[in-house]
Amino acid sequence: MFQVPSAGEIQELIGALKTGASAFVPEIFLSGLFLLVVTIDLFRIPSKRTIIPAVSVIGLIISGYFVYLQHAIPPDEFFLGMYAVDPFAIFFKYLFIVSGVFAVLISIDSVEVNLPESRSLGEYYSLIVAMVLGMFLMASSTDLLMMFLSLEMVSIISYILVGYLKGQVRSSEAGLKYVIYGSVSSGLMIYGFSIIYGLTGETNIFAINEFLKHNEVDSITLMLGSLLILGGFGYKAGVVPFHFWSPDVYEGAPTPITAYLSVGSKAAGFAMLIRFFRVTIPTGAGSTDLLAFDWVTLLSVVSVVSMVLGNVVALWQSNVKRLLAYSSIAHAGYILLGVIVADDLGTQATLFYLAAYTIMNIGAFFVIILISNEIGSDDVNDYKGLGKKMPLAAASLTIFLVSLTGLPPTVGFIGKLMIFSALLAKGPVFVWLAVIGVLTSVVSLYFYFKIPLNMYLRESEDGSETEFNVGMLSNALVAFLMILTVVFGLYFTPLSVLAEESVKIIGAVVMN
């Protein structure tokens, strides 16, 4: 029977809302920005195609300022323990804003996004803003219900954006496949949540930790629930065996959305995975201790298989977007190596790598968009002679691919170095993981460098050397991302310090 809340409970709820509102300013602002973009789209304004992306970019940058102000808030829980503000969440919010801003910017010159048969641009850009909002919530969620709702919010928006090109069969097919895979993974995850709730009677992850430390529950059931939850997070992060959606979705989606999913969605998945497992794993050694299960071995196997499968299958890909999809699976494996370490050094390496991956992967996809605009193809074999036709784009893409491989002097090299160093510092047991990481990076050299091989060492079939006319804004953005890739490879201290300061997670424990 429904019970009317008491005056004290109502007062407590109002107090929680008032306290939480001050910590929720970035999310409130993004909600307003979403409504503003939708509203602008309702009016017949001649320059609407310019105004909407401009408003979106400016709004996202302003939201970054509000995130910056959160540094002054002591790490704490808000909204009755459903939402946290801590350095860890703030770091990911910066990452989501950067990926969102560049998703908007690279969409401006994308021919496929601006096709006449495409949906409303206001709808497109407002959904990018809404997705940033959803990822904000994912990074700060400290309650099973909030985790599920925020992940579903991001997933549903992703389904729409992947199928944005309604006039193209491959986009609609990619959207449908994404919905099917996403629905299955969401079902698995919510079932895992229900098992954890059934065992503990709690949805707050800190309360779950406390319950498991002081009470006995069935270990097998607990492991089953945790594995199902891992499946849900793994789907968003794109690790094996939850990767099946990646190749088809990356190939069929509009390229700016492919770039956005490859960095923003992946980072959000890892944010939830790291927070959940570093907080809910209790430090005790009782029969219900999650550490009674060898999580390190399980995650190590997932990481190794992701690195091997992603890099090996990419060897046979001729479509650039599909190639980078398998590359993304491999990089998810590298990132997972830092998660396995599960201490501050490992978390720092993970955060640094995610930031590095955001820069170099968005840069690579941006160049692919510019090339596709000119030649109308994503096939590697059609890249012949582009070193002369698009000199800046070709040089930049080569730098991004060098960074994705993990070679100096790029930020990708520093990222992998930090991951492998964290593994070696953890102990000799983890050396084999670092060795496999290095070997799979060597394998990636082949499929990454067949792209520059075509651009510089093979002539185009038409024999033409006439340069394509790429816009000034596009060239400036590509050059900026290329410079960041090299500069952070040579002078990585600012990014490393930011990652180091962002490892503080409320209630986190170390997995031994």
Curated annotation (Swiss-Prot):
InterPro entries: NADH-Q_OxRdtase_suN/2, ND/Mrp_TM
Residue ranges of coiled coil: none
Transmembrane segments: 23-43, 50-70, 88-108, 120-140, 144-164, 179-199, 220-240, 254-274, 295-315, 323-343, 351-371, 394-414, 429-449, 477-497
CC annotations in GO: plasma membrane
Molecular function GO labels: NADH dehydrogenase (ubiquinone) activity; NADH:ubiquinone reductase (non-electrogenic) activity; quinone binding
Enzyme Commission designation: 7.1.1.-
Catalytic reaction annotation: a quinone + NADH + 5 H(+)(in) = a quinol + NAD(+) + 4 H(+)(out)
Pfam family, one: Proton_antipo_M
Membrane topology reported for the UniProt record: Multi-pass membrane protein
UniProt keyword Lipid metabolism present: no
HAMAP family xrefs: NDH1_NuoN_1 (MF_00445)
Classification via PANTHER family: NADH DEHYDROGENASE (PTHR22773)
Family: Belongs to the complex I subunit 2 family.
Quaternary state and interactors: NDH-1 is composed of 14 different subunits. Subunits NuoA, H, J, K, L, M, N constitute the membrane sector of the complex.
Protein name: NADH-quinone oxidoreductase subunit N 2
Organism: Chloroherpeton thalassium (strain ATCC 35110 / GB-78)
Name of the gene: nuoN2
